[in-house]
């Protein structure tokens, strides 16, 4: 349940009726950022007596929206990054803040469009998020969410138990790849991922080590190091 402009008034009745008829109200806050102004733009604005607006989309802004939704009966709160804009460091800040301030579970949703979706998911997991949204291997990455297979590897290394049937996921993944190939004329990607099943396959030691290094970087809030992996 969400409003693209985070207008809480627009979702009040939806939350009420979802709960009235026995549903779970998963209420989302849409993540976005303020415009970026160059130093030249700032100087011009000051010279013309039109100072640029103060930041709107602060951590406090997102927390306030989450608290409002919780007070309306949200059964969980999703930090919904529809455009893949949130970097790992900001993810860590918001997840920690939400977990400290909210009484309901917190979900994290992002995309890989700019290239750091998986790093942000790892950061969310390490900072205590309850749920992360993923995609299957053959449809993950790019404009989609990170691959569940990679998240599974990270969680295993972190000692986090996942209630997932990875064998069933592998079968679904294989079947849907066949369908994707049938629709290849409409696919922007001309290369498909190599087959991979984390239950049966393993990485070379030097690749496996990257997962450990990424976890260590995320734990230390070293965003630049995390993005290297």
State where each predicted segment sits.
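Catalytic cores and adjacent flexible loops of soluble metabolic enzymes
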Residues: 4-229
């Amino acid at each position: 349940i969400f409003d693209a402009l985070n207008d809480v008034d627009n979702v009040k009745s939806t939350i009420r009726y979802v709960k009235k008829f026995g549903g779970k109200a998963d209420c989302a806050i849409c993540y976005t950022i303020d415009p970026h102004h160059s130093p030249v733009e700032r100087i011009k604005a000051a010279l013309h007596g039109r100072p640029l607006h103060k930041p709107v989309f602060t951590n406090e802004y997102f927390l306030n929206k989450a608290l409002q939704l919780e007070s309306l009966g949200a059964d969980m709160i999703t930090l919904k990054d529809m455009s893949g804009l949130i970097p790992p460091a900001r993810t860590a800040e918001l997840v920690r803040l939400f977990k400290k301030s909210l009484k309901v579970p917190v979900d994290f949703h992002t995309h890989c469009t700019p290239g750091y979706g998986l790093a942000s998911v790892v950061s969310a997991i390490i900072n205590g998020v309850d749920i992360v949204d993923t995609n299957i291997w053959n449809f993950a990455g790019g404009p989609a969410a990170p691959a569940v297979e990679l998240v599974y590897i990270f969680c295993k290394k972190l000692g986090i138990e996942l209630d997932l049937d990875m064998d069933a996921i592998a079968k679904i993944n294989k079947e849907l790849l066949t369908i994707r190939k049938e629709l290849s004329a409409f696919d922007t990607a001309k290369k498909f991922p190599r087959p991979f099943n984390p239950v049966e396959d393993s990485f070379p030691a030097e690749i496996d080590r990257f997962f450990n290094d990424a976890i260590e970087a995320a734990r230390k809030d070293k965003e630049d190091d995390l993005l290297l992996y």
